[in-house]
Amino acid sequence: SGSCQFKTCWHVTPEFRLVSSVLKEKFQRATFINSHNKNTGVFHPRRLKKKRLAKELVYFEKSPDFCERDTKVDSPGTQGRVCNKTSHQMDSCGNLCCGRGHNILMQTPSERCNCRF
């Protein structure tokens, strides 16, 4: 009579917040690769080490400026958008106004009521 032993190993996906945080850091440190017509398909980074480059993000086209209106990519820009001055999220004035400044608009809503005095 023999005995049988099982061992099970598995990988668990990390929390989405952790993954997104790592990706954001990599995005902010991404390296621009200047491509040209003489490109042979071989990339020789001068300042980057091969091991580091394998774990980092690289890009060869600059992102469009989403602050300004661009009809080619159907981007309306952010001018005239309402921002939240107390927010630290995507709707914050720092993100939406793109350094152009913003105006503070105070509004007092008026509603009809059937009040009698």
Curated annotation (Swiss-Prot):
State the Gene Ontology BP annotations: canonical Wnt signaling pathway; cell fate commitment; neuron differentiation
Q: Which GO terms describe its molecular function?
A: cytokine activity; frizzled binding
Primary localization class, coarse: secreted
InterPro entries in the record, alphabetically? Wnt (IPR005817), Wnt_C (IPR043158)
The PTM entry states:
Palmitoleoylation is required for efficient binding to frizzled receptors. Depalmitoleoylation leads to Wnt signaling pathway inhibition.
Covalent lipid attachment of type O-palmitoleoyl serine occurs at 1
**Cited Gene3D superfamilies:** 3.30.2460.20
Instruction: Give its localization.
Output: Secreted, Extracellular space, Extracellular matrix; Secreted
What's the superkingdom here?
Answer: Eukaryota
The record's annotation in Pfam families points to: wnt
Known function: Member of the Wnt ligand gene family that encodes for secreted proteins, which activate the Wnt signaling cascade. Involved in neurogenesis. Performs a partially redundant function with wnt1 in the formation of the midbrain-hindbrain boundary (MHB) organizer.
Please give the name of this protein: Protein Wnt-10b
The top of its lineage is: Eukaryota, Metazoa, Chordata, Craniata, Vertebrata
